[in-house]
């Protein structure tokens, strides 16, 4: 399922590039989680599963090259192994100036190797309509992340 979603997202981004002729533009941003709720922990053998809802702040680059901060609400699920390896998935909706844009991401730490992927989901609304992006993220603290997302802007 993850592979189908990834291929669909890549195809949508490629279509956006082909349609507009625009190359993806790099956007360096941050995410700061400001609250967590509905915190749940479940043990299954040597695996620990943690999930919670969150709110926070997330930078996004607009088509005019301005960087603005939106409010995000989302849900995160994390699996932690006894050896310290873990994986996580999240879905969030960013709200800014009356518009919304969905994001979906996943990351994993295996043997000290961090891999991540984040992408926009859907068409966006209001001032966030027509924004498509894909990139990576890293944790910079317990509730903060840095991301690099390449955006394509379609009319």
Region locations from a protein language model:
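Beta-strand-enriched cores of mature, soluble protein domains
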Residues: 23-155
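Bacterial N-terminal signal peptides that target proteins for export
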Residues: 1-9
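Bacterial N-terminal signal peptides
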Residues: 8-16
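Boundary at the C-terminal end of the N-terminal hydrophobic targeting segment
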Residues: 16, 21-24
């Amino acid at each position: 399922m993850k592979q189908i979603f990834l291929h669909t997202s890549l195809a949508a981004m490629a279509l956006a590039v082909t349609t507009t002729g625009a190359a993806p533009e790099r956007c360096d941003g941050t995410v700061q989680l400001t609250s967590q709720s509905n915190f749940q922990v479940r043990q299954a053998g040597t695996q620990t599963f943690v999930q919670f809802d969150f709110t926070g702040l997330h930078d996004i680059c607009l088509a005019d090259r301005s960087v603005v901060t939106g409010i995000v609400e989302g849900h995160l699920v994390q699996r932690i192994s006894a050896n310290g390896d873990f994986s996580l998935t999240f879905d969030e909706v960013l709200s800014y100036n009356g518009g919304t844009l969905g994001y979906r991401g996943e990351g994993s730490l295996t043997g000290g190797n961090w891999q991540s992927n984040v992408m926009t989901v859907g068409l966006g609304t209001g001032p966030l309509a027509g924004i498509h992006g894909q990139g990576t993220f890293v944790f910079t603290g317990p509730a903060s992340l840095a991301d690099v997302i390449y955006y394509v802007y379609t009319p």
